[in-house]
A protein has these predicted regions:
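Short glycine-centered segments of the SAM/dcSAM-binding site in methyltransferase folds
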Residues: 103-104, 128, 174, 223-226, ...
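Mobile active-site "lid"/loop adjacent to the S-adenosyl-L-methionine
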Residues: 137, 174-215, 227, 231-239, ...
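S-adenosyl-L-methionine-dependent methyltransferase catalytic core, i.e., the SAM/SAH-binding region
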Residues: 151, 162, 173-174, 179, ...
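Conserved catalytic/ligand-binding micro-motifs in nucleotide and anionic cofactor chemistry
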Residues: 245
Length: 457
């Protein structure tokens, strides 16, 4: 049952519609998966899936799963990065940004990574996706999930929104703010959300959301687009939040939230939830529990100015070329400390420990890289030899020695921000030979020219 505060507030706002819109909370929480375009198409997935599902109304790549005992984390497709287990309405926000390959995209509150994986699929390996999480333990889980999903162009940060906005002003073409919220849409799925819910929490989350939105506005380039979303129904965090933002930021305009997609879902916003401030609620979107999801709110905001021209496919802008050249030169000169080597097994164990520590509330920011050492020059030479044999398409990619192994970096400036991963960790040297890392195959497996194909069909 919802809290007394929640029920009183919503009955006052909705009147007789309360019973209709909140008819579903007594039922079992909806379950779903979102398919990655980096792996397959929704049509191919639907044909091959060995569990009952139906297309989700909230996202063309998402499906509702109708099997109560289904364990998505145990399915081979999960481990292969084919899908991300995601509550159906949670998949709705990312497509609304209209991300195109080559863009610079920021997911400001990204953990555990479901929406970031959708944004990465839209980028198709071009441009850069900056996925940030403030809580260190959750940032480790975010990094692990993006590796599993085969994302090759992500920069994973463990930072505050304010530091990102200061370091990268007007840098991003698209920004997603899936804000930390009071979680009223999670009452069925997460009992702890119901236990912690109170009026003070709503006010606290509204204040935090406003601060994050201001940082997002500073990081967004002229002509860029920002999507704000929550999984709550509180007016202060939804329509009221957006209306107040527009008062503070006259350089922004509210756009039709569905303007970048060719489908519709949910309901329009509510006039009596704007806090008395002007807002065209027909341009924002709500998903109520009775509509097939747990609950979501979304708005799209456009910053005044001319959008950045995207580079042609396969090309970098002059400044991106400088960033990559600087990273490559740093690797050649061995500016990093001599790298401790690790085999693939020890790397996987380190990732497992990081996930375990995250669950227990602690954090490991570095890998246990195992025994032995190799110089940066030795590591790079071993990678080049391995790449020529198995991944010739990657031979010309800039490579640097970092964190105990070889990294294929993303075109991204040196900012002083706390970076957990910026590119693909392809492997390391052990006893004189190159040992590939799992991330190499999740990100670039299709480029391998000397391997045996496997299929789950």
């Amino acid at each position: 049952m919802p809290t007394e505060y929640f029920e009183q507030r919503e009955r006052a706002l909705l009147g007789q519609r309360y019973e209709q819109l909140y008819a579903a909370p007594q039922q079992t929480a909806e379950r779903g998966v979102t398919v990655s375009a980096l792996r397959t198409t929704p049509e191919q997935f639907a044909q091959r899936a060995d569990f009952p599902l139906e297309p989700s109304p909230f996202c063309k790549a998402a499906f509702v799963v109708h099997q109560p005992d289904f364990k998505p984390g145990r399915h081979p497709y999960h481990h292969a990065g084919v899908f991300y287990s995601q509550e159906p309405s949670a998949s709705s926000a990312a497509p609304l940004l209209g991300v195109q390959p080559g863009m610079r995209v920021l997911d400001l509150c990204a953990a555990p990574g479901g929406k970031s994986s959708q944004l990465a699929a839209a980028l198709q390996g071009r441009g850069v996706l900056v996925s940030n999480e403030y809580v260190a333990a959750r940032a480790e889980i975010l990094k692990s999930n993006l590796e599993r999903m085969g994302v090759s162009n992500a920069v994973v940060l463990n930072e505050t929104p304010a530091r990102i906005a200061e370091a990268l002003p007007e840098f991003f073409d698209r920004v997603l703010v899936d804000a930390p919220c009071s979680g009223e849409g999670m009452f069925r799925k997460e009992p702890v959300a119901l236990q912690q819910h109170c009026e003070a929490l709503v006010k606290q989350c509204a204040e935090l959301g406003a601060q994050i939105l201001d940082c997002a506005a500073a990081a967004l380039a002229p002509g860029g687009q920002l999507v704000y979303s929550t999984c709550t129904f509180a007016p202060e965090e939804d329509e009221g939040q957006v209306a107040a933002f527009l008062q503070r930021h006259p350089e922004f305009a509210l756009a039709d939230v569905l303007g970048n997609v060719d489908y519709t879902f949910g309901s329009v916003g509510e006039e009596n939830r704007t806090g008395g401030l002007p807002l065209d609620v027909s341009k924002v979107r709500r998903i109520w529990p009775c509509q097939g999801g747990e609950g979501h709110f979304m708005a799209r905001l456009v910053k005044a100015g001319t959008p950045r021209t995207l580079p042609p496919e396969g090309e970098y802008t002059p400044e991106e070329q400088l960033w990559l050249a600087a990273a490559a030169e740093a690797g050649k000169k061995g500016k990093a400390k001599p790298a401790k080597v690790a085999d693939a097994r020890s790397a996987r164990r380190a990732d497992s420990r990081a996930c375990r520590d995250a669950v227990q509330g602690t954090s490991r920011r570095t890998r246990d890289t195992g025994a032995g050492e190799a110089t940066p020059a030795q590591s790079l030479a071993a990678w080049q030899e391995f790449a020529r044999q198995y991944f010739p398409a990657l031979v010309q990619r800039p490579a640097v020695v970092h964190g105990g192994g070889v990294l294929l970096p993303v075109a991204f400036p040196q900012t002083g921000l706390h970076v957990l991963r910026a590119g693909v960790f392809v492997g390391s040297v052990q006893k004189g030979r190159f040992v590939p890392e799992h991330h190499l195959f999740t990100a670039f497996g299709s480029l391998c020219t000397n391997c045996e194909p496997l299929t789950l069909a």
